[in-house]
């Protein structure tokens, strides 16, 4: 029931969904692997809704790891109850919810033989998602947490300070302070939640201490950067923290003259990818699908996307082969030919040479 914001009455949808949940057993909330602030905030918001409206607590399950220091601080400071999915006995749960991801996308660890009952997301609709009983996918929203915030408001549920802080930080980080893919519902929620959030907790989340490995990976990304005009490609090689690819993609998009960034890094048994752009004529979700076709899975939307190609072991040769494969596909798709890649140092020297000499 329900397939998008343009046809969805939120009050009716949540009323009927809660009535359906009320007559069933234990509830499981599944979020995507290596969770980010959006899915974390969405999960505790839905959990709070169930507590307040049907008097039932849900279990939040995730896979992978939370390695980005800001996300770790968020989970700790806001006391988000999380259970590794490996400890979950799926037979115990009568209701399965999925947030900020969809069945079959490859970025969540729900077993393929387990169906999803309640699905809430803001990414493009997958055909398999239409089989779920309760579906609310709003591609015109920048953040899944905004949808969950609207559920709470529509149902008249009180938001405590920690929940408000979680939802605010999710919108803040996902949209980069409303500057990336934020629409009116996201802006409205952001402004209302700001007044309810705990500013000291926000400071603790946004200014955590960073491990030395973080700086070593940043240094590796800087050294392995290749620039093709307005395109930048960086390879973090073998990574300690899977979330670094997304962080480095955002980081390098701030470089003057750069409009598109592909960041990659080897983790586990594959190569993780993150794509970021400021170009409105490109769709990052479609573009990254081209990159991984036949070798992995990916998902995303207008300005940001992520993915993984499988079977890339942690050897220099395999990592280099994967980089060449992805770079060649991207350059071909963008019709970038006969452009010799530059390093950051080479770019600096070229720009210094091209700049007109100032008279003293």
Feature locations, PLM:
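Hydrophobic helix-and-loop "lid/oligomerization" segment in the mid-to-C-terminal part
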Residues: 2-37, 41-72, 77, 92-93, ...
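Short alpha-helices
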Residues: 122-190, 326-327
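A generic local secondary-structure boundary/capping motif
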Residues: 85-88, 105-109, 135-138, 156-158, ...
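Active-site cofactor/cluster-binding pocket
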Residues: 73-134
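Solvent-exposed alpha-helices and their adjacent loops that cap or buttress functional pockets
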Residues: 20-21, 88-91, 109-112, 127-129, ...
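An acidic intrinsically disordered interaction segment
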Residues: 1-18, 105-117, 139-144, 148
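Acidic active-site catalytic centers that drive phospho-/nucleotidyl reactions
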Residues: 36-38, 100, 121, 174
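Hydrophobic "anchor" residues on beta-strands that sit immediately upstream
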Residues: 28, 32, 96, 117, ...
């Amino acid at each position: 029931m329900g397939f998008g914001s343009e046809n969805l009455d939120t009050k009716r949808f949540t009323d009927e969904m809660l009535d359906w949940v009320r007559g069933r057993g234990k509830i499981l909330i599944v979020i995507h692997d290596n969770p980010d602030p959006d899915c974390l905030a969405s999960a505790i918001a839905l959990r709070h809704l169930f507590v307040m409206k049907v008097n039932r607590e849900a279990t939040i399950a995730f896979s992978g790891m939370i390695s980005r220091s800001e996300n770790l601080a968020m989970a700790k400071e806001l006391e988000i109850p999380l259970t590794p999915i490996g400890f979950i006995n799926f037979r115990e749960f009568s209701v399965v919810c999925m947030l900020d991801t969809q069945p079959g996308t490859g970025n969540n660890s729900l077993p393929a033989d387990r169906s999803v009952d309640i699905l809430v997301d803001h990414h493009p609709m997958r055909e398999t998602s239409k089989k779920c009983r309760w579906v609310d996918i709003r591609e015109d929203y920048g953040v899944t947490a905004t949808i969950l915030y609207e559920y709470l408001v529509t149902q008249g549920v009180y938001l405590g300070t920690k929940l408000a802080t979680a939802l605010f930080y999710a919108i803040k980080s996902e949209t980069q302070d409303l500057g990336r893919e934020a629409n009116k519902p996201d802006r409205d929620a952001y402004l209302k939640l700001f007044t309810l959030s705990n500013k000291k907790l926000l400071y603790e989340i946004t200014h955590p201490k960073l491990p030395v490995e973080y700086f070593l990976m940043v240094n590796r990304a800087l050294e392995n950067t290749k620039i093709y005009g307005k395109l930048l490609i960086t390879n973090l090689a073998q990574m300690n923290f899977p979330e670094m690819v997304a962080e480095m993609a955002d980081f390098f998009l701030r470089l003057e003259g750069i409009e598109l960034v592909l960041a990659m890094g080897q983790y586990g048994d594959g190569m993780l990818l993150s794509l970021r752009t400021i170009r409105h004529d490109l769709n990052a979700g479609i573009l990254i699908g081209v990159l991984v076709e036949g070798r992995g899975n990916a998902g995303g939307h207008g300005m940001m996307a992520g993915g993984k190609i499988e079977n890339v072991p942690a050897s220099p040769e395999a990592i280099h082969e994967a980089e060449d494969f992805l770079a060649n596909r991207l350059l071909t798709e963008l019709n970038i030919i006969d452009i010799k890649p530059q390093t950051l140092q080479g770019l600096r020297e070229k720009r210094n040479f091209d700049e007109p000499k100032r008279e003293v």
